[in-house]
Design a protein with these regions (language model features):
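Charged docking surfaces used in two-component/phosphorelay signaling
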Residues: 16-24, 91
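Short hydrophobic/Thr-rich beta-strand motif most characteristic of the beta2 strand and flanking loop
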Residues: 27-34, 42
């Protein structure tokens, strides 16, 4: 069965870049959310195998969404995306249960390595 991945970022171009990278490498069950609140709602609806989520977003940021998701499912696989210079936020995310973090702008092979490590192959 295909692995479901939820891509969460308020920037449409970042979601598209992630989607393109993953779809070119065999991941087909890709879903999108535009902010943390949308991510929590879609997590409940889709039960994805992995969530890749930005930290800085409107309405509900990635850290709040991470805590909400992990509160619902303690085994949820969540990877945070962050720009350079947000190291303290990244450490907060890891302490809150994030499996890994990817620095933006990301390199496609770094995204794939992280996804493959957590989920196995496509």
């Amino acid at each position: 069965m295909a692995k479901k991945i939820l891509l969460v970022d308020d920037a449409a171009f970042m979601r598209k870049m992630l989607k393109d990278t993953l779809s070119k490498n065999g991941y087909t069950e890709l879903y999108e959310a535009v902010d943390g609140a949308d991510a929590v709602e879609k997590f409940d609806e889709l039960k994805p195998d992995l969530v890749i989520m930005d930290i800085t977003m409107p309405n509900m940021d990635g850290l709040e969404a991470l805590k909400a998701i992990r509160g619902k499912d303690g085994s949820a696989n969540v990877v945070m995306c962050s720009a350079m210079g947000q190291e303290s936020m990244v450490m907060d995310a890891v302490r809150s249960g994030a499996k890994d973090f990817i620095v933006k702008p990301f390199k496609p092979d770094r995204v794939l390595k992280t996804v493959t490590t957590i989920l196995g192959g496509a």
